[in-house]
């Protein structure tokens, strides 16, 4: 009975959520679109003609926003473990990003192109136990940073969902070695009870002289 009540409360919160209603009205696949739109409004992160990688893309809310902003001259490579309905001019790679074969598929899709921006809204399935969830979340963050270090052009940018807890401070220090400017963002469209924040790193310096970050 308690579980049924919890499910009912979640559904009520979901459908009463103004961002869910806005997404339905505006044609976005998820409320997450407004998190990226809010960051974009503040930081002007995405520009026409850019090459972008979107990790944790399904159901496609961030990809929809990014595709519109980069326009026909831009290029977007998206990936998720879940299926995602196609979006025009978006290359989608389905698979588990923790597996090397999926990394290789992404790198193959990138080819010799230098990437302007890597964005990641990835998160593990949460158990509610911090001792379990934080290592899983940080593992995904490390892998996303590893990819960014491989593909970003000098001066490129990196936006990633993070959860503060064990391992975050070391991760934050690693990023500060690789980028000129690092800031935290908490969009108003992110639910108050959510521990998520977004780390925005700008001005990729390249890996020369910085700590080597190895893929696990």
Curated annotation (Swiss-Prot):
Pfam families: FtsJ. Coiled coil: none annotated. Disulfide bonds: none annotated. It is found in: Cytoplasm. Gene3D superfamilies: Vaccinia Virus protein VP39. GO terms for molecular function: rRNA (uridine-2'-O-)-methyltransferase activity. It catalyses: uridine(2552) in 23S rRNA + S-adenosyl-L-methionine = 2'-O-methyluridine(2552) in 23S rRNA + S-adenosyl-L-homocysteine + H(+). GO terms for cellular component: cytoplasm. Keywords: Cytoplasm, Methyltransferase, rRNA processing, S-adenosyl-L-methionine, Transferase. The keyword Zinc-finger does not apply. InterPro entries: RNA_methyltr_RlmE, RNA_MeTrfase_FtsJ_dom, rRNA-MeTfrase_E, SAM-dependent_MTases_sf. S-adenosyl-L-methionine binds at residues 60, 62, 80, 96, 121. SUPFAM superfamilies: S-adenosyl-L-methionine-dependent methyltransferases. The active site is at 161 (proton acceptor). Its EC number is 2.1.1.166. NCBIfam families: PRK11188.1 (NF008390). Specifically methylates the uridine in position 2552 of 23S rRNA at the 2'-O position of the ribose in the fully assembled 50S ribosomal subunit. Belongs to the class I-like SAM-binding methyltransferase superfamily. RNA methyltransferase RlmE family. This is Ribosomal RNA large subunit methyltransferase E.
